[in-house]
Regions:
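Conserved phosphate- and dinucleotide-binding cores of soluble alpha/beta proteins
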Residues: 71-211
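N-terminal active-site beta-alpha-beta segment that forms phosphate/nucleotide-binding
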Residues: 2-105, 110
Length: 211
């Protein structure tokens, strides 16, 4: 894991967007297409807007979510709605969106993956929560399931998430976090989901942090 520290959140968001774009360009020198997975929530909004403004060969880039709430797409809590306001409001192509269902995830599992991730104060990433009933399966990098439903008391809505078995295959992953609390959670070794992510990704994970 590489930790990059920035003085403000705008700089961290821009650096994370540049990181994703640079890895996309690098992969597409040897691959005809790839998959970019991004999170919901408030933290990545600026980063996703900046990423959507990048001059990339978007026709060769499939876009999916790391996780989603089981709500209609036009619901205020829908992560898809965030994509519409950010990535798809820029140059990214909505027709290349890969929904979080078993068939779509299976069809794209062969594609090289670059992912942007967020993290909660409880150490969760995507929708892999510490209290999830499915925690062991979600964190098993060798599991067969690439997508799973999540039962957690941390969310008012049922959720779906890409599992560690899919996310750990990423060529590169950027973790964008803000605040001293989240940095402390990240840096303290333990059994939280993010600790498993750091171990599984090793030097393929770059953390972008700002106060």
């Amino acid at each position: 894991m590489e930790l990059k520290v920035f003085s403000n959140r705008a700089e961290a968001s821009d650096a994370a967007a540049q990181f994703i774009a640079a890895n996309v360009r690098s992969i597409l020198t040897n691959a005809s297409e790839l998959l970019v997975a991004v999170p919901g929530g408030s933290t990545p909004r600026a980063c996703l807007t900046l990423l959507g403004a990048q001059d990339l060969p978007w026709q060769n880039i499939a876009v999916t979510l790391t996780d989603e709430r089981d709500v209609p797409r036009d619901h205020p809590d829908s992560n898809f709605g965030l994509l519409c306001d950010t990535l798809f409001a820029g140059q990214a192509l909505m027709k290349r969106f890969v929904p979080l269902n078993e068939d779509a995830v299976s069809r794209t599992q062969h594609l090289p993956l670059v992912t942007l991730l967020g993290m909660g104060e409880d150490g969760h990433f995507a929708s892999i929560f510490p209290d999830a009933a499915e925690r062991d399966i979600l964190l098993d990098a060798g599991a067969e399931h690439l997508l799973a439903s999540v039962t957690t008391g941390s969310s008012p809505h049922p959720r779906f998430t890409l599992t560690m078995a899919r996310l750990a295959r990423a060529v590169a992953a950027g973790l964008l976090i803000f605040g001293d609390g989240k940095r402390s959670v990240l840096e303290v070794p333990g059994s939280l989901p993010v600790s498993h992510l750091v171990q599984a990704m090793d030097d393929r994970l770059t953390v972008f942090w700002a106060p």
